[in-house]
């Protein structure tokens, strides 16, 4: 039986921390779906389609195997998506105890609703302070985001800023 896991996130934009979690999760599961989700509580900097395209490029540039794919989910419960693709695990990156506190109730509900387990991965310490919201703030103020994002993302943001 194939072990399929989903790494959900808004990825607005995808960071080196995200890539670290994706890379490590890809080694743990037979198939990994990086799921770009619409979060109704957030106003995205990048449209959903652009985020999907950027993550696809980042995954390709990182040389990750074909067992890693990207998809998007516009609305609904993550466990419904998991059922559709046969996934039994959600993988989340957690940077701090605050992230663990935030993720715990959702993990318990996901397990209750669909018998989907949540695996929390700690980041590489080099990326533990990086978040998409931090990158958006630095970008909005004209700062250099290259230490925090893959090259394809830095390039796309530079083009966007110039454009």
Swiss-Prot record:
Its cofactor is Mg(2+). Pathway: Cofactor biosynthesis; coenzyme A biosynthesis; CoA from (R)-pantothenate: step 4/5. Pfam families: CTP_transf_like. GO terms for molecular function: ATP binding; pantetheine-phosphate adenylyltransferase activity. Gene3D superfamilies: HUPs. Its EC number is 2.7.7.3. Substrate binds at residues 10, 42, 78, 92. Coiled coil: none annotated. SUPFAM superfamilies: Nucleotidylyl transferase. ATP binds at residues 10-11, 18, 93-95, 103, 127-133. It is found in: Cytoplasm. CDD domains: PPAT. The record marks 18 as: Transition state stabilizer. One of its GO terms (cellular component) is cytoplasm. Reversibly transfers an adenylyl group from ATP to 4'-phosphopantetheine, yielding dephospho-CoA (dPCoA) and pyrophosphate. This is Phosphopantetheine adenylyltransferase.
């Amino acid at each position: 039986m194939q072990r399929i896991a989903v790494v959900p996130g808004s990825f607005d934009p995808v960071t080196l921390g995200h890539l670290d979690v994706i890379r490590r999760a890809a080694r743990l599961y037979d198939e990994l779906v990086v799921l770009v989700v619409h979060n109704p509580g957030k106003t995205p900097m990048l449209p959903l389609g652009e985020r999907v395209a950027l993550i696809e490029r980042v995954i390709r540039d990182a040389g990750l195997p074909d067992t890693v794919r990207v998809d998007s989910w516009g609305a609904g419960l993550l466990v419904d998506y998991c059922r559709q693709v046969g996934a039994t695990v959600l993988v989340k990156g957690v940077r701090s105890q605050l992230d663990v506190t935030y993720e715990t109730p959702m993990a318990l509900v996901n397990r209750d609703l669909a018998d989907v387990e949540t695996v929390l991965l700690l980041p590489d310490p080099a990326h533990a302070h990086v978040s998409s919201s931090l990158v958006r703030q630095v970008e909005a103020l004209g700062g250099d985001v290259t230490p925090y994002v893959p090259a394809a993302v830095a390039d796309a943001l530079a083009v966007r800023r110039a454009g």
